[in-house]
């Protein structure tokens, strides 16, 4: 099912850890992109990034990355070409990725005077869970626990990215008919519910 939907694309699960939640004031401290390229070759990009500002204790207490951990690490401007190459034209999968991770990374590019990469399609597992009317809570940890996905290292970018990929695979099993169409239609349906064939293909349960 997923293979047919994503065949021919570079598919990457994406997650960030940051100094806070403000795209204007805060900065990235960890970025992970994990998945495979168009030929099925594995991709695992997981980097600690020097944010150039102090990391608040409250943030460090969540993701476990402290000021000492980022000393001597590359800043975002040093990795932006690599990140752009990975994200641009890829199918990006992530939890709350449309409202947090992608806007956050866009601001980092603008801050560096560069245009951000443009994914081919984005699958947000938070929106997907809501579209499928999965019971609350909808945070990544709770959804993974409910679907039998191990998230031992929650709030590390690599673990969260991998978990969102596995969660997507599990969620597709709940309404398989929803994913028997082009990925552009799937993306549209997840975000807007705007695919005309919803009622006939998925039934009234959605």
What are these regions (language model features)?
Residues 156-170:
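Acidic, divalent-metal-coordinating active-site segment for phosphoryl/phosphodiester hydrolysis
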Residues 126-129, 144:
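Short alpha-helical scaffolding segments that buttress acidic/His motifs in well-ordered protein cores
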Residues 108-111, 131, 167-174:
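Active-site catalytic microenvironments for nucleophilic, acid-base chemistry
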Residues 121-123, 183:
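Beta-strand segments within the central parallel beta-sheet cores of soluble alpha/beta enzyme folds
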Residues 1-121, 133-155:
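Conserved non-catalytic scaffold segment of RNase H-like nuclease domains
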Residues 103, 126, 162:
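Active-site phosphate/pyrophosphate-handling residues
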Residues 1-6, 167-206:
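Acidic two-metal-ion nuclease catalytic site recognized across multiple nuclease folds
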């Amino acid at each position: 099912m997923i293979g047919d939907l994503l065949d021919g694309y570079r598919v990457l699960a994406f997650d960030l850890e940051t100094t806070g939640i403000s795209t204007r004031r805060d900065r990235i401290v960890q970025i992970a992109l994990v998945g495979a390229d168009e030929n099925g070759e594995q991709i695992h990009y997981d980097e600690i990034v020097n944010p150039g500002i102090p990391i608040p204790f409250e943030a460090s207490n969540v993701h476990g990355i402290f000021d000492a951990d980022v000393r001597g690490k590359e800043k975002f401007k040093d990795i932006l070409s690599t990140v752009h190459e990975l994200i641009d034209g890829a199918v990006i999968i992530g939890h709350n990725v449309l409202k947090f991770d992608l806007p956050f990374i866009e601001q980092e590019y603008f801050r560096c005077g560069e245009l951000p990469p443009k994914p081919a399609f984005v699958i947000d597992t938070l929106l997907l869970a809501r579209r499928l009317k999965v019971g609350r809570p909808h945070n990544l940890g709770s959804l993974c626990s409910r679907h039998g996905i191990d998230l031992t290292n929650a709030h590390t970018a690599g673990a969260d990215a991998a978990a969102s990929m596995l969660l997507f695979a599990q969620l597709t099993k709940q309404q398989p008919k929803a994913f028997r169409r082009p990925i552009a239609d799937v993306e549209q349906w997840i975000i807007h519910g705007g695919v005309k064939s919803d009622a006939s293909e998925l039934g009234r349960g959605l």
